[in-house]
Amino acid sequence: MTEEEIRQLAADYMGYFTRGAAAQDRQFKAVEMLWRLCRDDAGTGFRVIWVAVNLVDADNMKALSFLGTGPLGDLINFHGQDVTGLLIEAARENANFCVALSCVGRSMVSEGAWKDLTGALPSIRAHHSGLNS
């Protein structure tokens, strides 16, 4: 996928959740396409999620939680500990990503991946909170 296609998919995915009942076929397809990317192409799936996280206002907890319970959970479910290091680094770099990653549910991921997340996220959240004080 080109960077433009990644940006468009991220915008369409977020549009599915921000437009509600007004979502169009394009937004519905974006949800399925991102699920497939998370399953089949972890690198591109991550890029789309990264772009989507950066489209969201920091106070939009609903949108960030959709990213965590949706594609981030899918990415970890399909690729486990192969991607947790990358995701933890992204959470360190970006407070929105940290919030979204914190929304991944225990039942969605393997024991090893959950251990990685719960070991790293508390200190990352504390770091981001300290920056905002």
Regions from the PLM with identified roles:
Residues 112-133:
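Short, charged, intrinsically disordered terminal tails
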Residues 1-118:
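Alpha-helical solenoid scaffolds in large eukaryotic transport, assembly, and signaling factors
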